[in-house]
Each structure stands twice: as structure tokens, then as C-alpha cells.
């Protein structure tokens, strides 16, 4: 199989946008169309070397094929450092993309089992941060993996997702999941925690999402977010052009962490996300550096499974992903 990069973005509508953290329009280009095309080809080669030639096309999802097309251009805000697509896909097309996906039940069940193991560590970290248990809402609950992990830690979490197909699957496993987006969700009670894992960077309007989370939380509630680090992407791209050796290392770090081709709308850094949260009524409790969850499966070559176990933890020095925990600031008297 070979990738058809000539069709990138050909069926999408775009619009120019400003930085959603500071509102600025003064940016530096991080990657242009030719850069993204080169990265896409490098990403394809990276995974084709590590996967069996018999890998089903559907198992390439979130490796070389993503819900959104690769960006035309990636920029970095000169003021706050946010990395983002500009131009960006229009909101209505983004929503249609995520609501229309209908994976097979076997694929959803395999994802649920694999992701539940990964999410156990996040559920335990959440317990340590809050030093108590209570109620929570996971935004972008997808196959219900975190809901299962949270239940094991004796938390009562509900799910929220825009995709009715995956929501029906999660409900079939015994979880409470709502068909809605965060901005328009009207629950009957407030939550102790709102968790947004691996979804915040894909939302149409992260600023509006933070406001909504603030509205849904108790006065001392906590917002927990996990995102890819846009600063890491920009920094390693800049380093990669200085020599062939550095390009090889940089692309390997980015590929191991799903940052190559920047398959996200927004790439926050700890500093830019802290600024956004503080502006919207939260006090940051802490930031935890992280890496992409393991992706090796039964289609991964044996040497590549070992490589991922050994190499991926070493990439944490670049903080390719991070979690941030923030407490809802009490309203002024």
C-alpha cells in the first residue's frame, strides 16, 4: 500500500483563525505544505517497517490515518507559544467527522481492553491529586476505557461524547454515557472532576470547553487535561533541519509519540495551557510530563514491540505529552 497524499484536505473547508489562548494573529510558520507532505511520507515509512505486511487497513487508524486530514500549515503564536493549524478546518466539518465514525464492535472491544490497562495509571494519579473520591465526567469517553479504570478506583464517572455509535457500545458495558458536546451539556448535578484525556486538542473551541467545565464543577472541583505538546513538535522540527542525524532522531521521537504530521488542531505547551486555564478561573495544581500510550499490537513486528518498550520512555525528556491538573477558583465575593 502507498499513501495518497495528493488528496490531503481536498474535501475540507478551511478558515483562517487567531490564537485561542491570547487572541493574537502574529505567528511563525512551524511547518508548511511541503514539510507536512515530507513528514507524512516519513510517518508511513516508520510504521510500514514496524508492522506486518498483512496488517488490515483499519489497524492503521491513529498510526498513519487520522480522523482529520493532515494540516495545510502549522504555526506558532509569537506571544503565548500555542502551536495550531492555520488555516483550520471549519467547526461544522469537524463535528460531522467525529459523529459519523462507526467502527465495528470487535474493534471497539479490542480498544477498550487495551486502553483500560493504560488508563489505570491516570485514574490512580487522579486519586492521588484529589486525595479523595467522588463524581466525575470524562469528555470524549469513546470506548469507555477510562470509565472502567475509574470504576476500579471507586470513582463514579459518567461519559460524554458526540458519537452515538461508540456511546451505545460504552453503555452496553454498563457505563452512563451522554450524547452531547461539552458546551451544551446540562447535567442534573455538579461534578468533582471533569477529565479531558486526548481530546482537548481536537475540540472546536477549547476556550469554550474550559468555560463549560468551570460551570459543571463544584466550587473546589478539578479539571484534568492530557494533551500532546505543541512546543515539543515545534522544537524538534527546528532541530531536525540542522543535520541529517538530528532529523532522524527528531522524526523518530515525533513518530513514536504521534506528533509527526501534527494530527491535531491545537498543540498546547504547559505554559500556554496554564495561561488559558488561569484566564478562565482555574489555579494550576501541577503538570506531569508523559509520552504517548503504547500502540504495539498483534500486527507489530516483534523487534518493534521491544523497541517501543525501550525507546518510548526515553522520549519523556522532550515532554511530548503532558497532563495538567487545575482547581476551579472560588468565585469572587
Where are the regions that the model predicts?
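A short His-aromatic
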Residues: 198-202
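Surface-exposed loop/turn positions
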Residues: 134, 220-221
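S-adenosyl-L-methionine-dependent methyltransferase catalytic module, highlighting the catalytic core
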Residues: 13-16, 68, 204-215, 222-329
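Conserved N-terminal segment of class I S-adenosyl-L-methionine
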Residues: 1-197, 207-210, 289-292, 298-305, ...
